[in-house]
């Protein structure tokens, strides 16, 4: 079951970077709640926010890879919590590679035999108290 949950998480994440809104919608609950710390300090609800961003290629384009550092899965029946440090690596058009990291938690539930993401929380991956971003 853990492999099944991680497969959904990876399909979900790839859909964001590959502008695949159909897969994003299939792997995400309509009543999604999320915190994107770099966008706004307030909760956002529903799919419209990310669907708009996906359709307008907010994640950029070009060659990328992501890694989930220190992944953890906690399973409670039909509810799962995954947490990790998300590291995104992108090829720069002028050459070289850039990296960004942040921490994520995602909550999934199993409805009608399918796992869907119902909550996302992202936070900075630098040490508190907040000063200048490293």
State each model region's role.
Residues 2-3, 21-75:
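A solvent-exposed, acidic/Ser-Thr-rich amphipathic alpha-helical stretch
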Residues 12, 50-54, 68-73, 86-88, ...:
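Hydrophobic/aromatic beta-strand elements that line small-molecule binding cavities or substrate pockets
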Residues 12, 24-25, 32, 49-50, ...:
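Hydrophobic pocket/interface hotspot
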Residues 28, 86-88, 121-124:
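Short beta-strand segments enriched in hydrophobic/aromatic residues
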Residues 70, 77-79, 112:
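Residue-level signal for tight coil/turn positions that link beta-strands
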Residues 89-98:
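Short, cysteine-centered beta-strand-loop-beta hairpins and adjacent loop/turn segments enriched
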Residues 101-131:
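Short beta-strand edge/turn micro-motifs at domain boundaries
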């Amino acid at each position: 079951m853990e492999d099944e949950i991680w497969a959904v998480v990876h399909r979900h994440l790839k859909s964001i970077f590959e502008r695949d809104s159909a897969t994003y919608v299939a792997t995400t609950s309509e009543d999604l709640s999320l915190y994107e710390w770099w966008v706004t300090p307030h909760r956002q609800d529903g799919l419209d926010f990310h669907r708009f961003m996906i359709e307008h290629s907010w994640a950029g384009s070009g060659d990328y890879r992501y890694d989930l550092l220190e992944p953890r899965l906690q399973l409670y029946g039909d509810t799962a919590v995954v947490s990790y440090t998300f590291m995104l690596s992108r090829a720069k058009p002028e050459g070289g590679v850039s990296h960004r990291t942040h921490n994520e938690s995602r909550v999934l539930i199993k409805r009608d035999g399918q796992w869907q993401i119902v909550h996302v929380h992202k936070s900075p991956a630098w040490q508190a108290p907040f000063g200048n971003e490293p």
